[in-house]
């Protein structure tokens, strides 16, 4: 039999070794993190959901670093946490949950760059009683987070409608507008709670704005659980695989969706909403808007932007083989379009961005486009602005003067506006967030 004292001694030695190893590892991580901070210096925080760390409260435990699925977004330097790779943060929110001292707050927008979002309470209800918002429309772009919001919003609806009793004849418990990740998850949750529900979408099939992504685009998500379907273990997947998943979900759960239907108006009658659609009216006690930010594409406001060769999305780069392409924008959508076009034979690509550096793109995208420029595959025109678009040519201006760029095709990829007409119709108020937590003020 091994003496008890020997066992205790061995355990003590192992603990001491572990502590020394952990301390050394922390020093190495801190050194690497300092380099990371230098590398990403000047990169603006994203306007989407991201963490702000209170240095007076942070104890440097690095729980946030370990919890973040993106790995490089957060670091600990000199005993304090930092959002180092701001562009790499995609709003998981796991850091806030993991922090043992509540030093992290999740906010939208920054002091430099505000973001317009509908105001919602903790149950995702807007100031307009009975109208809820979930997913990208409310600033939650990550697929897993959007699905969770959809489910939680329906939980609140189910609780409220249960207290009210049965709905009047001909009136649904819930109308869901949008069949993207949030809308799909909300539909499943409504079915699970036994609510009478109708889900409609103006598009022709499931997936919402995901279907407009370029072919083969990598979509970032996290493991999620869908009501009536079960756990889905995904972190990086393609656009096509994600759409396939949603089709499988609908088939196996029996969820039904009405496609190609537009909302044209809404009014309140006898305590419920009567929503006018292109397929006729629908009456519902509650409405969940899960449309994503599918308002009008932002445009440049220059002569020629309405010409036929100007596009506001890139769905398939293979359609543009051999073309001279101008991409306008400095976010991930623009850079990913450049990367996709650069793989096609004969394409000649120019990327115009109004700022002097890429402030809002993921590190892998920034590195890739910079490498394409170094290889001569892409012409980068930073700190430039489009002045005029004509057939086959585009005129730009930068610090050196005016330039004429060949452009058989112009892709204006500078984001989309909120669907303000839809929101106004439902009486939803929009607020500009500048580094503030979501919720009413």
In which residue ranges do the predicted regions lie?
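Ferredoxin-like iron-sulfur electron-transfer modules
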Residues: 38-60, 74-91, 111-122, 137, ...
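Glycine-rich beta-alpha-beta "Rossmann" dinucleotide-binding loop(s) and their flanking helix/strand
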Residues: 72, 103-117, 290-315, 400-440
